[in-house]
Amino acid sequence: MVGVGPKRPPSRKGSMSDVPQNLLEHIKHFEEIFTVDTATLKKIVDHFVNELTKGLSVEGGNIPMNVTWVLGFPDGKETGTFLALDMGGTNLRVCEITLTEEKGGFDIIQSKYRMPEELKTGEAEELWQYIVDCVEQFIQFHHENENLSKLPLGFTFSYPATQDYIDHGVLQRWTKGFDIDGVEGKDVVPPLEKVFKERGLPIKVAALINDTTGTLIASSYTDPAMKIGCIFGTGVNAAYMENAGSIPKLAHMNLPPDMPVAINCEYGAFDNEHIVLPLTKYDHIIDRDSPRPGQQAFEKMTAGLYLGEIFRLALVDILDTQPGLIFKDQDTSQLRIPYLLDSSFPAAIEEDPYENLIETAELVQNMLKIKATRSELELMRRLAELIGTRAARLSACGVAAICKKKNIESCHVGADGSVFTKYPHFKARGAQALREILDWAPSEKDKVTIHAAEDGSGVGAALIAALTLKRVKAGNTAGIRDAQAMLAMC
């Protein structure tokens, strides 16, 4: 028997040698438009810092920089049982979290429910009824025949919301493919609590949070070096602690200047004016055809919701401008379906370990009903790499901007989301971009490192509910609307 030794990573050196010249020209064009060099990254970050600062001002800016009314990090001594409701772009998750006596300890039980596509463009009342259906089902399953009382809820509502209070929030605009009439500009807590009351459920929203804020708090609970929480998933966002004295729009609250206040950046809206982002024609098409043209410019270039669509549009562009160059004499009708491909499609292509791209060929055959040639597979492989690399490098700009704004030289960043956890090479590409932007010497280790976050939308929501009840008990009711109702939950 011959020992073959350790398996080497696949090498694609020279794999373009058999690609025809006219396809190579398209590959070269894609390389030109999707590559973001160091100078461009730095220019983006400088503008990003200015936009973050502007968002904290009284006048505001493109980036909302929403005040969350989470005042400080947990100390690990929080206790109690809390419900957490996580309404993301794909799933609805209901959790029961018990913060134990052990420092930093918790127990969790949870159930996940699919968010039906028809709800995303349906009626507001249908949304709230469905959410409460899921919560009621969860309680009946885990607490059958129990007489429950006083259930504080941390509601992870991962959409831009203005919060004058931690227990209330007005939806600014839908993102992640949602477009439900009658919710934007309205407080989302009363209609939810109304349905809880109608069903006889003793649940009070103790905290309305964003998943990014939850990620920040949950991660710092287990790692005090965590200073930033990020989401790289269906959408993109970050949260961090800002000193109250550096938030002009909070000056009227007369908070101690050094009091930490968690800011939910909502920086998917960065550069909506298209000043610094290197947009391609495909980015413009995505924006034009989206439910919210002119909004979420940064998110549309980096988030998982759009990466597969960028990939699809680039291929359709070749089909339309040079008919017969690719997929000759084949039915390409599947490829022309908008949003048929999500980010898992280019991710799977990048993960194909075989030199002959056999897995990519099978994927294309199964999803698009196209039998691709080896040259076409190489084109798709390179296109997937370019789109994934651009997303990772641009994503690093948001982290770098917060570090520069706060003069953070070294820290841990807690990250979550499907792109971060599942997209191949995303972490390494983002880390490389941070090195370039922040000018670390080649001999220096990475000073700002991105790590897998704790469960922000579950444990984070419970922790923030606990922190809120804790400060109500202590008499600190800043940013709390229903303090008396909250006190009754303690």
From Swiss-Prot:
A Pfam family of this chain: Hexokinase_2
UniProt cross-references to Gene3D superfamilies, sorted A to Z: 1.10.287.1250, 3.30.420.40, 3.40.367.20
Domain Hexokinase: 21-466
Catalytic activity: a D-hexose + ATP = a D-hexose 6-phosphate + ADP + H(+); D-fructose + ATP = D-fructose 6-phosphate + ADP + H(+); D-glucose + ATP = D-glucose 6-phosphate + ADP + H(+)
Record bears the keyword Kinase: yes
Pathway listed: Carbohydrate metabolism; hexose metabolism; Carbohydrate degradation; glycolysis; D-glyceraldehyde 3-phosphate and glycerone phosphate from D-glucose: step 1/4
GO molecular function: ATP binding; D-glucose binding; fructokinase activity; glucokinase activity; mannokinase activity
Annotated region described as Hexokinase small subdomain, given as residue ranges: 75-209
Gene Ontology cellular component annotations, sorted alphabetically: cytosol; mitochondrion
Keyword Ribonucleoprotein: no
Top EC group: transferase
The EC number(s) this enzyme carries: 2.7.1.1
Subunit architecture: Monomer.
Family: Belongs to the hexokinase family.
Name of the molecule in the record: Hexokinase
Protein encoded by which gene: hxkA
